[in-house]
Amino acid sequence: MKNKNLSMPSLKEKLLQETVEHIDITRFDARPIIDAMDHMSFTSRDLARATQIFNRMLQDEQCSIILSLAGSTSAGGCMKLYADLVKYNMVDAIVATGASIVDMDFFEALGFRHYQGSPAVEDRQLRDLYIDRIYDTYIDEEDLQRCDHTIYEIANSLEPRPYSSREFIHHMGAYLAQGKAKKEESLVQLAYEHDVPIFCPAFTDSSAGFGLVLHQVKNPDRHLTIDSIRDFRELTDIKIKAGTTGLLMIGGGVPKNFVQDTVVCAEVIGKTVDMHKYAIQITVADVRDGACSSSTLKEACSWGKVDTAYEQMVYAEATSGLPLLASDAYHRGYWKDRSPRQYANLFKSESK
C-alpha cells in the first residue's frame, strides 16, 4: 500500500504556491480614472498631474526619458510594466538598483518566480526553509542562488577587464537572447534588443555581487571588475547627447541621485547642459529626514539638477499608483510618434 504522505506537499511547497502576477497596462484603460482624479484632491490630483507631465515628456520631440528605479516594485507585480515601457518606446535609459535588475527581472527571466506571502509569519521558520521575504512576498533562496551562479557563468565567459554595469547588463541581455531565457520579454532582454541602456551604480549590492565575488575568488589572477566611475561617465554622456531630459523616478536611493547628478557632472567636465526639464517621483519617504530618497524635486533645483516648471512629487506606494500612470500613457498613445533614441549604440564598440 502506498504511503499517502509521499504525495503531500511539504511546508515549503505550501508557502510557495501563489505566484505574484505582473500587471499588464495594455489590458485596462486608466484614462477615465486619471481624468477623474484630476478633479479630486490630495494624492489623487498629484498622480493626475504626474501623469500629465509624463505624457508631456512623450509628446516633446526633444525629450529623452530616463527611468530611475529603486525598491521592490518589480517583485511586487510591476515587472511587466517596466518591460512594456521599453517595448513601447516610453523610456530611453534606465538607472536601477542591482536587486531590481538581477534579483527580480533577470531572476524571473531564468524561469524562477516571486510568490505571494504574508508579513505575519515566523521569519526564523522561513530561514530554516530557505525562503526569503520582501514584506508579503516570498523568494526561494535556492532559486536565487542559481541566479547568482548564472551571473558567475556570464562573468567567466567575458574578457577579464573593467566593465561598466551597463556593459555587463548588456551581456546579460545577450545571454537571454541566445536562447537561455525561460520567460519572454523580460526587461533585461527587451532593453538589450531595443538598445536601451541599463545602469546599476550599486550593481554588486544584489545577487550580481555574489556571482561576481565567486568569479573573482575562482579567478584570482584573471577576473573582470565593475567600474562605477565609468557608469557615471557613460550616463553623463547620454545626458550631454540628449539635451532635454525627463525623469520618471520610482523610489529614491542611489539611482535617483545618480541620474540627477549627471547635470552637475557635465558641468564639472566643462559641458553646458540644461537641468532635467521634467521630473516625477513616486515615493513614501519622509522629506524631514534630510535623505536623498525623500528630498523634493524643488530641493533638487537648488543643486542645479531639476527645473521646477514640470515637476511632481507623488507620495504613494508605487505599485498602487504607477500602473494607472503607465496605463494612461500607453492608451493615450503619444509613444507611437516618438523616435527611438537607442542610446546603447553610443557604446556599441565597447560591448563586443
UniProtKB/Swiss-Prot annotation:
An individual GO BP term: spermidine metabolic process
Q: Name one GO molecular function term.
A: deoxyhypusine synthase activity
Q: Which UniProt keywords apply?
A: Transferase
Enzyme Commission number(s) = 2.5.-.-
- Name one cellular component (GO) term: cytoplasm
Question: Where on the tree of life does the source sit, at the highest rank?
Answer: Bacteria
The family classification in the record reads: Belongs to the deoxyhypusine synthase family.
NCBIfam families given in the database record: PRK02492.1
Name the chain's protein: Deoxyhypusine synthase-like protein
Which organism encodes this protein?
A: Coxiella burnetii (strain RSA 493 / Nine Mile phase I)
